[in-house]
Design a protein with these regions (language model features):
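N-terminal pre-transmembrane cytosolic regions of membrane proteins
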Residues: 1-176, 433-440, 456, 505-508
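Serine/threonine-rich low-complexity intrinsically disordered regions
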Residues: 19, 159, 281-284, 345, ...
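Acidic, low-complexity intrinsically disordered regions
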Residues: 27, 53, 79, 106, ...
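N-terminal juxtamembrane/topogenic regions of multi-pass membrane proteins
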Residues: 29-32, 39, 173-179, 183, ...
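Extended alpha-helical interaction modules
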Residues: 85-296
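Amphipathic alpha-helical coiled-coil segments and their boundaries
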Residues: 238, 247, 284-287, 291-294, ...
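Membrane-associated alpha-helical segments
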Residues: 304-419
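Hydrophobic alpha-helical transmembrane segments and their immediately adjacent juxtamembrane loops
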Residues: 368-510
Length: 510
């Protein structure tokens, strides 16, 4: 039924951006193991490239790369069959392609070839999360074969013997759906194609079975392995753009739901509106402080909205380009095919994902505008409320200072002498200075209630005033001695600090 079973592999790595170092490391390791594990120790003649990339691994994917049709390097295993590997450049992606096509006398089928390729992958680092984190866009395993009967054409219909043979011999992904044999399609070249991959939309690895007619060896090679110019074949280009699409879906899914971000922003907006619901904005100090904190929280979420919104637009454009490239390569399938199968699934995913990203970006931009407008309005409201509070404090402070100055001026003009004993005068002067200091610190506290250090300064000023008043009282009472003075001053400082703390706590509860 089947002959010339072979395994083709295309590994796509993104060698630009943050993943460049990891992607180059994966490519270099897999390329080296193609030699040590698969025996590909010789260069491929008449390709114009060596067995290693010219200029080393750090030289690509720059614009100065030489080679034929993007070919960077090629290697092969000497002996019967075709055991070759090729490195190709496709813009910012490097494709490592491998063909394991043993000679008939080697007696190797898909199962044995699949196991040999699995041995090439880095031990312990072949998991999907690990490869994704190192810049691998996707991997495609192509199980290729031709019919043994001359003149027969492959047909993927369920009632044909071909489907039973393919099902028995294919090393399908363990997570592939049970109904995969019924999803085969025929492409315009006449090949029968099945996908035996896992059903996850964001899957890293894809597995395709491609069966050609007995006389289509050249056509199958050009479609799945390499062109006459050593370039990436049609199916390889299609799988590259499909891998870009599914990689973007993986990144989008890993970023979490944008709906939760919008919900958090809406909750912050609602809280801010409630805090500033009074006709003239927040009035009391505690209300002003809570509204200010709510505004800061909203501004922090606004930055997250900007980041997610712009990234959604960029991703939507990337998906749009990938979908256009998939369509340019033959509509829902490379070369055209009847509806259904893996290629129609790619096309449907691109359409759905593009619409989803466009909707997400629209909703995010609406939430961002709401956040900006409410935040700007609230900021103005808080500034006016703070300004009114500052004006009130300034008016009270000006009145108090004016009253003191008027009293001092009247005393001086009337030549009135305050009857204070000599020992009391220094203490009285100190008390007046401490009172002036405390008043200024209270003003600072009112202006910046959210700063803890202002409360500390007010406590220190109250302690200083308490100590000065205690000194004044002891001097007026005729208590002498430095020890008594220090004791009284300490007691007064403690009393002043206690009063300041009580007043501060009551203000906080309000």
């Amino acid at each position: 039924m089947l002959q010339a079973e072979a395994l083709g592999v295309h590994l796509f790595a993104l060698t630009g951006g943050a993943h460049r170092e990891g992607a180059l490391a994966v490519l270099a390791e897999v390329w080296g193991r193609c030699g040590t594990v698969l025996g590909m120790t010789d260069p491929v003649e008449r390709t114009g490239v060596a067995m290693q990339p010219e200029g080393g691994w750090e030289s690509f994917p720059g614009t100065a790369v030489t080679g034929t049709a993007g070919l960077l390097a090629a290697r092969m295993r000497p002996g019967p069959g075709v055991w070759q590997a090729a490195l190709r450049r496709e813009h910012d992606v490097v494709c490592l392609s491998v063909m394991l096509a043993p000679a008939a006398e080697e007696g190797l089928g898909w199962g044995e070839l699949d196991a040999r390729w699995s041995a090439v992958l880095p031990a312990g680092q072949a998991t999907e999360e690990c490869l994704r984190g190192r810049g691998v866009l996707g991997v495609a395993r192509l199980y290729l074969a031709r019919l043994a009967e001359p003149g027969a054409r492959p047909a993927p219909e369920p009632d044909r013997p071909l489907m039973a043979a393919v099902r028995a011999r294919t090393p399908a992904d363990p997570a592939a759906p049970d109904g995969w044999p019924y999803g085969g399609v025929t492409v315009s070249q006449g090949f029968a194609v099945w996908e035996v991959s896992a059903a996850r939309d964001a899957r890293l690895e894809r597995r395709l079975v491609v069966v050609a007619a007995e006389d289509q060896d050249r056509e199958l090679t050009a479609w799945a392995w390499t062109t006459r110019a050593r370039g990436l074949p049609l199916l390889g280009k299609y799988l590259l753009h499909a891998a870009r699409l599914r990689y973007q879906l993986y990144v989008w899914s890993a970023a979490g739901s944008a709906g939760r971000l919008r919900d958090a922003v809406d909750a912050a907006v609602t809280e801010l509106l409630e805090r500033t619901a009074a006709p003239y904005g927040p009035g009391r100090e505690a209300d002003l402080l809570r509204a200010t904190r709510a505004l800061v929280g909203l501004q922090a979420r606004e930055r997250g909205l900007v980041d997610r919104s712009t990234r959604s637009r960029e991703m939507a454009r990337t998906v749009e380009i990938a979908a256009a490239n998939l369509a340019a390569l033959g509509g829902p399938s490379p070369g055209g095919a009847r509806p259904g199968g893996p290629f129609a699934d790619d096309h449907a995913l691109a359409e759905w994902f593009g619409r989803r990203l466009d909707d997400e970006a629209t909703y995010l931009e609406a939430a961002l505008r709401r956040c900006e407008q409410v935040g700007a309005f609230t900021d103005q409201l808080l500034q006016r409320a703070g300004q009114r509070r500052q004006e009130t404090v300034n008016l009270g402070l000006t009145g108090a200072v004016g009253a003191v100055l008027m009293s001092l001026t009247a005393i001086q003009s009337l030549q009135y002498t305050v009857p204070l004993p000599g020992p009391v005068k220094p203490a009285a002067v100190t008390s007046l200075g401490a009172l002036a200091l405390l008043v200024s610190l209270v003003v600072l506290r009112v202006v910046s209630p959210e700063r803890r250090w202002t409360a500390v300064l007010v406590g220190a000023g109250a302690a200083a005033l308490g100590a000065a008043l205690a000194w004044t009282a002891m001097s007026a009472a005729g208590v002498a001695g430095a020890g008594w003075t220090w004791t009284g001053g300490g007691t007064g400082a403690a009393a002043g600090l206690t009063v300041a703390g009580v007043v501060s706590r009551r203000g906080g509860r309000r």
